[in-house]
Amino acid sequence: YEHLVYDGAKPTCVATLSDEARARTIIVAGFSKTYAMTGWRIGTTVAPLPIAKAIAELQSQTSSNVTTFGQYGALAALKEKEKTAASLKLMMTAFDRRRKFLHAELNKIPGITCLLAQGAFYLFPNISSFGLKDVDFCSRLLEAEKVAAVPGSAFGAEGYLRLSYATSDEIIKKGVERLARFCATLRK
């Protein structure tokens, strides 16, 4: 997610903090989000040499190779820097618009509070005021309004939802309208 940041935020890699930190850091990155290669299962690892060798040995025994098209796609993403940068800029402009819209709409719903994310393409609204476990909230929301949300507890954030805005503006608008309608039924 290091390229999916907003409002001038600059992520800091822990490996850049000191030589000691670099010697103890393993960096794992994927192509799924930044390069829209979701499901292709290709990524990179940067680690001190002994750890990198151990990772390579373990990987060779636990999974098969990356698909050929995935390798070519990753190579093109890295080699075609100008095209990649232009595509990323277009994607981030759309994500930023959706992020701001969803954030504003969520905060209009009585009982929900939500901070504005600085990276990725998820928001984590707080739904704890409704008195339901987040898992139950998500299950009931799906059943009642056909809106899929991920319980925050899956990420260590009980009482929150994870909502993605990596979809169309229309779907986000419909989804937040349905979420608001569902929340209104919980307040009755």
Set out the residue ranges of the language-model regions:
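PLP-dependent class I/II
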Residues: 1-188
